[in-house]
Amino acid sequence: MIRGARAAVFTVALALSARPASAQQGGVIPLPARIIPGSGTFQLNAATVMQVPHGDANALSAARYLAELWKRSNGLTLAVSATAAGNEADARIAFRSEPGFGPEAYRLEVAPKRITVSATTGAGLFYGAVTLWQLLPPGRNAAPIPAQTIVDQPRYVWRGLLLDSSRHFQSPAFVRSMIDWMAWHKLNVLHWHLTDDQGWRLQIRRYPRLTSVGSWRIPASVPGSPAPQPYGGFYTQDDVRGIVAFAAKRHVLIVPEIDMPGHATAAIAAYPALGAGDDASLPVSAKWGVHSHLFNLEPGTFEFLQNVLGEILQLFPSRYIHIGGDEAVKDEWNASRAVQARARRLGIHDPDALQSYFTQKIGRYLRAHGRRAVGWDEIMQPGLTSDAVVMSWHGASVARAAAIRGNDTVLAPDPMLYFDHRQSSLPGEPPGRLASISLEDVYRFEPHDSQLTDIQQRHVLGLQAELWTEHISSGRRVEWMALPRAAALAEVGWSSPQRSWPDFLKRLASMSARYRAFDLDYADSVFGIDARLARTAGAIGVTLSNLTELKDAGLDSAIRYTLDGQEPNASSMLYAAPLKVAAGTEIRAATFLGADQVSRTWSVRLDGHAGVRRSSHELELCSNGVGLLLEPDGNSGSTEAPLAVDIMNPCWIYRDVDLAHGPQVLAAVAALPFNYELGLDAAKIRAGDNQTPDGELEVHVDGCDTAAFSVLPLAAAAHHDGVTVLPAQKLPPIAGRHDLCLRFARPSLDPLWALDWVEIGD
């Protein structure tokens, strides 16, 4: 749990003692602060006794959680018993409370006859138990554990993840599961984003329309298609109480966020009198992006917000309450006579100062009830009180400014810790932001700011990654986008800054096995297979690699493959150089560390399309506006591969095409709903230059501004859901090899046309 308002810091001696020690710690993530090797081993097996002192509730809770983890991940069943001093068994695991440790610190001693976990707090004992769990290799119910002493404590007190339950709703069972795997990584803050323009997800008894109306939206659809079913859901207060209690047992603090004054469309749709605009029939939004709907400044609106917060304070014991404050577009405030009249009465002439007034008023209410306001960094305006916590999403410079002025701050930078970005360029990534934020990017993020004094640095509480869910439509996808990047985040927030990327990868292989044991749908991108196909005379060239240079990291890595459709194993053929494979062959490949498979199996049957068909992932985007991976049918939960598109400029480059023999072009396209709130930027998008009623896919040669070389009409796809293959078009012959530009000419912004794949061949 978060204790007080200062970051925990390592002593110099402890920080200097931190070092990778894979032989002793097996697969522990995050890496402990100090590991001292011992002599001999402790033989852990089903006969081991787990003991706690009579009456020590913290020790009993930690021991029971450890027993539960080992049973679920390793099939090892150990009994937990309370024992009076002097009655300890010889071969035992003992938990004991001792004074003198920090709030989350612990000591774990492994000796040949006993293991002892010591700490002052329940959190310390819990984290000692989690570390001990990870010392047993995954999948084994008995093993020798090397003797060692681990002395450990976190670097930062705030090590968090944001879960956006507004854009897409997750079940209470999933939220509990997420809290569980957060605890395995010693992540201790769940920032729960419960309200936004697209849905209000928390039951407020005094205002039932917040959930009867505000929690439901009609999803966006392509013009002319059948109306979708309403989408939504909400958490009852009983749900929340159960989740909060579950989290407390795992020492995860839940910080609720109720967004204000912006991101308020769902609340205003439920109670129109709260809004600053004139639209009394505003729906809950199905559009992504920044909306202009703000709460107004009437006394009744502040009464509403305080009543809502009053119920929230009864549900969440957290000292911290997040009030949003980001992206509050002031257009409605500026246009509202009522808002402007109130601003004049308050003597406020600047819209940002008006938001500062709003923030201060809410902050005073929370302070009067013993809580602290947390807000996105837009709240950092003159008049911000020193007890407010600034969550910096605009980067280190904003966090630095907050710390210098004396405000506590949490680093949550976009894009580095925005986990709605895909993890790699591999084709198996789910929908999300197109730009990649890799596992290594997260691991190499350094929160320490050398420009701050030691006193100022103590205002940096820690760091947090964000799981915005506009395009993350299910709990399984949340797992993929979070894991294993959450493991890297945990190590940055807990361990010494002297971290080792190669050592982390070795430990991650063990952690990945634990993910599989708990059926978590984690991304294996760091170990995944990057395959390139090229058609050659009489065969298909296959080049395999890893995006991560595993051998350069000192790992015993290998790619192994089969050509008979069988699953690869540690004895399969070793990939050493590009292959030439006959058409019709099914090739399967996977990455191994030693004898252990660490990636999912990549497979493909080399049919007539291999080497000539390129997906939107394999093409280059013509521009870098708002690049997204989108579901091909525009709906949540599609099983088809997402489409890579820049929504500001749907345009792709197909490089190095031989046009000498006049090949044909075959393309698969999809019409998607254009559900983006872009404000004035929407005017920058090209539309209205179509030659046929439904538009065309244009093919240009050596540049996108040349005259169209060929045109594929969209009529065949205009009224179809999902992906449609357009009729093939023969390209005129031109000597040499050329780059092709493919872009859409469309009558309007909606629908958004996207390319699934294109094939250039005979």
Mark where each language-model region is.
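Bacterial N-terminal signal peptides that target proteins for export
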Residues: 1-9
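Contiguous, structured surface segment used for ligand recognition
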Residues: 24-158, 477, 493-518
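Extracytoplasmic
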Residues: 603-762
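Feature activates predominantly on carbohydrate-active enzymes
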Residues: 100-306, 310-320, 361, 365, ...
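Active-site neighborhood of glycoside hydrolase catalytic domains
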Residues: 272, 284-286, 290-386, 393-401
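Bacterial N-terminal signal peptides
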Residues: 8-17
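Flexible, acidic glycine-rich loops studded with aromatic residues
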Residues: 373-388, 394-541
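Short, compositionally stereotyped local motifs that mark structural "simplifiers"
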Residues: 51, 94, 505-635, 673-679
